[in-house]
Amino acid sequence: MAVANFLNEAKSQGNKLFLQFGGQGSPWLKELSKLYESEPSLKEFFETAFKTLAEEIPSLDKKIVSQGYDFESWLKSPDSAPDESYLSSASVSIVGIFLTQTANYVSLTNKGFATSELLANALGATGHSQGIVPAVLVSLGKEGAEFYKEFSKFLKFILYLGYRAQELYGVFNPSEEVLKGNEEIGDKQPAPMVAVIGYSAAELSERVQKTNTDLGLSGTKAIYVSLFNTPDSNIVSGDPEALLAFRKKFKAEMDEKKVKFVYLRTTAPFHCPIMDGTENTVPKDMERIGFQYKGSDLKIPVYSIFDGRNFQNEPDVSLPLFREVLIKALHWDKATANFVNTPKVVGIDFGPSVVSQKLTQANLGSSENKIYSASSPKDIKVLLA
């Protein structure tokens, strides 16, 4: 297979690559359906995915995944898929997003971006929230049958991250009081996570802490700044009742300062201590499926979304990976610092959609580095030119 012109140009100009993967909150079914329909080279990828999911479905509680994980039927006939509220639920979307971004990666490796070439020229990799999981998968450097063996394990792992998170939190069903309270102040579709756009991280943290103190909230009842995305766009996680109280407390100020308050399409509060209880379930799942990796298994640096450290230096990668997706706060500036601060680096984002690409662009500042998205038709033309 010929090496893509984009890669050859990067090498000739002395540019390194940075690989990144998106996180929750992105629509995925349309993008994944298009890959399923239009990419014959992904036949083995989808067959492996469907077989892997079928192995786990019988042991799952129907209360958590009431309409199952019938991705094969949904992709063959998108019109027959469940409604958006089910597809965006934490236990389902985490799987759909992982499949979409990994399919984008595999598709690109079949078009002149062979794994060996990508990794040989990579500065490193990371992923926004759950995107750190495929970043580790890719960094193993596996190809062919060896890749699909690992892919199957990673798919089971991410399935259980979403499933156990929802199991712990319970099926999301906001009370009439919460629905009415949000409606009265003009907010829609309450959720356990909300984007607050317009406060600095320090300003938001101060207001979150004041809310917890004034209302006597602590532990699983408190609210937390859970994802520090850009200088003025961050996420707060917590019970919808507490998030509503936070919103009411500062709504006048938010309106005055034009601060946006937008609920995410998800059904569990990730990246905060409310998920501490998954320590009792996920490690057992990991042991059962054989999900165990060391830092020395990684062929390129994978940067932590909590503190930016290189996972290659970790004796164990598996447990930190679980904790970074479910429990620990995300600091996107730390995860992408090496990309932002190293000259002559080109980023490739594997989606889904362009959300994580835009988050990274917002942190580039004066850097001249560029990042292209495999989910963007315009950017794909550049990558495959």
Write out the residue ranges for each language-model feature.
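Acyltransferase/transacylase module recognition
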Residues: M1-A122, P273, G277, K284-E287, ...
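Long, contiguous juxta-domain segments that are non-catalytic but functionally important
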Residues: M1-N5, Q130, A165
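Beta-strand elements of modular eukaryotic interaction domains
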Residues: N8, S88, A125, A135-V138, ...
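Gly/Ser/Thr-rich beta-alpha loop segments that engage phosphate groups in nucleotides
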Residues: Q24-P27, S129, V133, P240, ...
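Conserved SAM-binding loop
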Residues: T126-G127, I235-V236, D349
